[in-house]
Amino acid sequence: MIRAVLFDVGGTLHEVHHSPELETSFCQRLLDLLSAHGIALPITAAELAPRLHENAEGYKHWSEQSRLELPGAKIWSEYYLKEFHLSEELLSPMAEELSWMYDAVRVENIPRPNMQETIRTLHREGLKTGIISNIISTTFVPRLLEDYGIADLMSCVILSSTAGVRKPDAAIFEKAAAECGVPCGEMAYVGDTLSRDVLGCRNAGVALSIQISNPSIAHRDTAFTGTGLAPDVLIHDLSEIPGIVRAFNAR
């Protein structure tokens, strides 16, 4: 019996669109924020953008291997801005704002069709809903849920930035289950990746793994091609979820 449906955020509740213009604009805001705190970097926004992308990929690789999420100031100091030798202590006052901007300004987030109504339908049908998200910001997701008008429907919001551990580690799913008061064996999880979401469900013993199609991130799952790892259900629209859960519970 499914009693809770939890969601990933980026790529699941909304699609994430990238562009060189957004990257450069973000880097200019980053430089302006640092300057406002008395830190002047000897680089232009256009020069910083590709370097930041490369550094972020380096951190992503490390975090995916370790399944750990470092504190924001440490990420910016040791990875994202590593060439500039800025200490954690120096970056700490602005680290969260930088991390929030990384997901709010660097990209365009476009809500998926039927997102709010799907979550409201699940809630009306007596199911708990919540979030498990890999993210370096501690404030981006809570602010986003408020903007989407669904914050009050969430029984739990578990972020790697506060948990210190990332999907696909079972621990982050178990933390969400404990906070929702529902065991993993009575939980469904909706995400867009095999490598983090579907594998995480398998690791934690989540009852129902639902993957929503997202071709833009397929390259991150190439290592799992041909391994047999697959979701219980693949969907193309969030509105499919209530019916899937009803059918599961009717078995």
What annotation goes with each model-predicted range?
Residues 45-99:
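A metal-dependent, Asp-based hydrolase signature
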Residues 21-31, 68-78, 135-136:
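Short acidic alpha-helix initiation/capping motifs at coil-to-helix transition points
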Residues 99-101, 158-159:
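Short beta-strands and strand-loop turn motifs
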Residues 67-74, 89-93, 100-129:
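Short, acidic loop-to-helix structural element flanking the phosphoryl-transfer center
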Residues 56-70, 102-113, 166-172, 207-208:
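Short amphipathic alpha-helical segments at helix boundaries and their inter-helical linkers
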Residues 1-5, 15-17, 21, 39-43, ...:
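Asp-based, Mg2+/Mn2+-dependent phosphohydrolase catalytic module
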